[in-house]
Regions:
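Glycine-rich cofactor/substrate-binding loops
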Residues: 2-43, 101-105, 286-463
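Generic, well-ordered alpha-helical scaffold segments in large soluble proteins
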Residues: 47, 51, 68-75, 97, ...
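Conserved hydrophobic residue
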Residues: 56-57, 271, 386, 408
Length: 463
């Protein structure tokens, strides 16, 4: 084995001068893509097994390559592998080390493939694996949310529109809204697997190959459903990256929304949520402070996820077919979004375990702001043969009356209510009871306690 060959870039027989130092700095991606070493080695092993099956390489060469690749994987895992920026990326670092271990036979590993199809194969396998990890963390968040909801089915609070009291709800119903969102996030990540399940390996640089390869074989070996259909599209395609980044962004947005609400609700003005000392920080100057820094961190990180998505969209928008160096950034963007989301899910799960509702304050706030006004309008429609619009107008007059008298709706007596609607009897007074209000919303998906219990059981059975 010629020693000088292993110390040079693979293309040095064509390009005679060494790259400038600035180009070497910009051109290498090993600090980023070394995370793909397992996927890269797995893909290479499947590839050489296929080459042997198709009688493109010998049994001896196949075994030597697999031996070398297995040894390299152990070296990297045990932190005994020396990554060299001179060799640019994970693919060439592994190939160069393979030459050192088994000699010139290492040159057969790249038969009938290119780094163009190699890197997409690696990244697809990595995202498939990461999707499972994200969904496992989403399962934990859903489980913690269900647990908190189950404890608070009969905890009554105001539901808000425009951040103003709207109608009474169960705190559990509010939490179950986020169970729905996080469940959709899980489904969104899972649905992405369809596009991830097409095998890029074997399309080579952009045209396919003249070797008699079997792409169905490598598809099966690597856990793909089928090979991709068009070689040019395959090396150009980063739709699967966009799908992943979009899913991360939507999930981050859901986390940000509930973080924002918990920040507001834990503030002195609302005082609806108690945050444990385990998840708050103090102030360097104000001794009394307990700040929701972790929630603020989660809220801020959604912006990072959006930025990663827009970065990738912007990279792709002007690229002709097929492969360009612009695409080198895809891996860093994916890793950054992935790591941020998994970290946020773990943090949020801890927050859920260390948060509790201030039940008394929730009820007090729900009992203000004329929150049962809609219940009165519905009562008039059902019991006094009014159209909803007429009942709405009558109820608005009742609210005006209560406001004028500085009373809650529940504090108005029957005689006062009859000023607006003379036909009213004592049975109208029950509509102002908050528990009755909540439990009257029995329509599917509504906030009635029985509905919530059924929905919690439904999700618990899914786990």
């Amino acid at each position: 084995m010629a020693k000088n060959k292993n110390n040079q870039a693979i293309w040095n027989t064509r390009i005679k001068k060494n790259a400038s130092s600035i180009f070497q700095k910009v051109g290498n991606s090993i600090d980023i893509d070394k995370r793909l070493y397992k996927e890269d080695i797995r893909g290479s092993i499947a590839h050489v097994e296929m080459l042997f099956k198709q009688k493109i390489i010998s049994f001896k060469i196949k075994n030597k390559i697999i031996y070398g690749l297995t040894k390299i994987e152990k070296e990297i895992f045990n932190k005994k592998f020396e990554f060299n920026k001179k060799y640019e990326d994970i693919h060439m670092n592994i190939e160069k080390r393979l030459f050192q271990i088994i000699g010139e036979e290492a040159g057969y590993v790249h038969t009938a493939r290119s780094r163009n199809d190699q890197v997409i194969t690696d990244l697809k396998i990595w995202i498939k694996s990461s999707t499972k990890e994200i969904n496992l963390n989403l399962d934990k968040v859903i489980k913690s949310t269900l647990k908190l909801a189950e404890k608070n089915i009969d905890t009554i609070m105001p539901g808000f529109t425009h951040l103003k009291n709207a109608q009474a709800i169960s705190f559990a119903h509010y939490l179950m809204a986020y169970v729905e969102m996080f469940n959709r996030d899980k489904n969104r990540f899972t649905n992405n697997l369809d596009n991830l399940n097409e095998n890029p390996l074997g399309v080579a640089a952009l045209t396919g190959t003249s070797f008699n390869i079997d792409r169905n074989y490598t598809s099966k070996k690597l856990g793909f459903k089928k090979p991709t259909n068009n070689s040019i599209d395959t090396v150009s395609d980063r739709d699967f990256v966009l799908d992943f980044l979009y899913s991360v962004s939507v999930c981050s947005m859901h986390i940000s929304r509930i973080a924002e609400e918990l920040i507001i609700w834990s503030s002195d003005g609302f005082n609806l949520i108690n945050l444990s000392d385990k998840i708050v920080t103090g102030s360097s100057i104000m001794p009394q402070k307990k700040n929701p820094d972790l929630l603020e961190y989660l809220r801020g990180k959604s912006g990072s996820s959006y930025g990663n998505l827009f970065s990738m969209l912007t990279i792709l928008k002007g690229l002709p077919l097929s492969y360009f160096k612009d695409l080198q950034d895809d891996k860093e963007i994916v890793f950054r979004s992935n790591d941020t989301l998994i970290n946020c899910l773990k943090i949020f799960n801890e927050i859920l375990k260390n948060s509790s509702p201030n039940k008394k304050r929730m009820f007090e706030l729900a009992n203000s702001g004329y929150i049962t006004a809609t219940d009165l309008a519905d009562f008039l429609v059902k019991n006094h043969s009014m159209s909803f619009r007429k009942a709405y107008q009558k109820t608005a007059l009742v609210v005006n009356l209560a406001e004028k008298k500085k009373k809650k709706l529940s504090e108005l007596n029957l005689e006062e209510l009859k000023i607006i609607e003379p036909k009213l009897t004592n049975d109208v007074l029950k509509v102002f009871d908050l528990k009755n209000s909540v439990n009257s919303k029995k329509s599917y998906g509504g906030t009635a306690f029985d509905n919530i219990k059924k929905m919690i059981m439904k999700y618990k059975k899914q786990k």
